[in-house]
């Protein structure tokens, strides 16, 4: 005798929903070209660093100490932007696309063992403040050649970065303490 199974009225809906969920989940791979583009950008900054260092070395005898300091600050700026690119590339890929699976690699940076969106946001904001600080140093070393209005706007922008980072850290602290309260 044939057994009557109840017909699931939502079976077709569940199947379509599952397909949509798979498409949405797979869409994260569309970010891969963006991260590869950041690697190309990192190569451009590596070239810029080598070129800047070479120019500093071959022209050192013709430079005064302020010009040398500006050249060094420019190199530090390039390094900090390169570090920012590495953090965004590795952290973003690991958080949003797929795990890198480098847990046992001897050269794995320490911060990768606990990378998450919150850690990445804090590291990014600190990097931006560091880059902004380098720009501020360059501005003040070269203050005699800078319009006062430009210096004021750079200072205000830097203060804005600082306030944003403090607000972000405070918000993360509140969220962390709220989510870890014992009842």
UniProtKB/Swiss-Prot annotation:
Keywords: Cell membrane, Membrane, Transmembrane, Transmembrane helix. GO terms for cellular component: plasma membrane. It is found in: Cell membrane. It holds the Pfam family UPF0114. It is a multi-pass membrane protein. The chain crosses the membrane at residues 30-50, 68-88, 124-144, 150-170. Disulfide bonds: none annotated. Belongs to the UPF0114 family. NCBIfam families: HI0507 (TIGR00645). This is UPF0114 protein CGSHiEE_00455. The lineage of its organism: Bacteria, Pseudomonadati, Pseudomonadota, Gammaproteobacteria, Pasteurellales.
């Amino acid at each position: 005798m044939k057994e009557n199974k109840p017909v699931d009225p939502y079976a077709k809906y569940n199947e379509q929903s599952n397909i949509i969920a798979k498409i949405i989940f797979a869409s994260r791979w569309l970010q891969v070209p963006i991260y590869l583009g950041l690697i190309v950008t990192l190569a451009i900054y590596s070239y810029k660093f080598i070129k800047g260092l070479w120019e500093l070395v071959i022209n050192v005898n013709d430079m005064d100490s302020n010009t040398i300091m500006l050249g060094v600050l420019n190199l530090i700026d390039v390094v900090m932007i390169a570090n920012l690119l590495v953090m965004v590339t590795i952290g973003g890929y690991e958080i949003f696309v797929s795990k890198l699976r480098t847990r046992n690699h001897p050269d794995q940076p320490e911060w990768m063992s606990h990378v998450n969106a919150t850690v990445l946001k804090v590291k990014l904001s600190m990097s931006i403040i560091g880059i902004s600080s380098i720009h501020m140093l360059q501005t003040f070393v070269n203050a005699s050649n800078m319009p006062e209005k430009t210096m004021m706007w750079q200072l205000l922008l830097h203060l804005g970065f600082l306030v944003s980072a403090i607000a972000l850290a405070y918000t993360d602290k509140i969220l962390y303490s709220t989510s870890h309260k014992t009842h």
